[in-house]
């Protein structure tokens, strides 16, 4: 059996997150989804047809990044998220939901989309004018990797961030293709609840974007 060794420092980096500064909470009002859209990487490779001889989706994970400037002093922030594929979310380079590994878990790829909502107040820089980075990585999962057929074409991410400011006002930031940057990259090559996760610890996660990132595209597959 082929084995690999991951340095302990890499493991420590992988598990450090906002917890206990972030926690899973009840979902926001479902009507807020209307202020967002599914987004994908524009040039992501696409496999279609039947999966033969154990063929996998192309290596690599879809990454999405947005920088948001505080419009006032932040009192609280709640982030409602979902993905087409196995996904993880980050705030300012730290995991905001690592307790929910391999999200969304066992779901029907053609019928069900589970959302995961987190209070991320403790992850944020809170001063007026300060900026926070929100990021998501979405691998193929069952959505576009092998089961029998490659169901979806591209991994996608959708989210709604609701920020409450100290003056009592609220602002909703939904995923929009023209406001988020996207690219294929990161250390995760594949992830699925049966096959587990393939992770290259030599690769630095692009929590804050990078030169390869371009404007995301809208995804209307689901």
Where are these regions (language model features)?
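Accessory beta-strand-rich segments of carbohydrate-active enzymes
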Residues: 54, 59, 64-202
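Generic low-complexity segments that are intrinsically disordered, proline-rich and/or Lys/Arg-biased
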Residues: 8, 21, 46, 206-207
């Amino acid at each position: 059996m082929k084995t690999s060794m991951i340095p302990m420092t890499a493991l420590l980096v992988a598990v450090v997150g906002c917890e206990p500064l972030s926690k899973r909470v009840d979902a926001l009002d479902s009507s807020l989804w209307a202020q967002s859209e599914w987004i994908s990487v524009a040039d992501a490779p696409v496999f279609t047809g039947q999966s033969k001889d154990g063929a996998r989706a192309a290596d690599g994970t879809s990454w999405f990044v947005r920088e948001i400037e505080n419009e006032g002093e932040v009192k609280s922030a709640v982030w409602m998220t979902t993905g087409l594929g196995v996904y993880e979310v980050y705030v300012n380079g730290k995991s905001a939901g690592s307790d929910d590994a391999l999200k969304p878990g066992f779901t029907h790829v053609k019928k069900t989309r589970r959302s995961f909502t987190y209070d991320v107040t403790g992850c944020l820089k809170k001063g007026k004018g300060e900026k926070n980075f929100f990021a998501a990585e979405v691998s193929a999962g069952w959505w576009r990797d092998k089961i029998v057929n490659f169901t979806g074409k591209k991994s996608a991410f959708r989210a709604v961030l609701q920020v409450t400011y100290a003056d009592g006002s609220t602002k909703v930031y939904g995923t929009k293709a023209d406001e988020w940057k996207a690219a294929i990259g990161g250390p995760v090559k594949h992830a699925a609840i049966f096959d587990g996760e393939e992770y290259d610890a030599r690769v630095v996660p692009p929590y804050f974007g990078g030169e390869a990132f371009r404007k995301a595209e809208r995804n209307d597959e689901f």
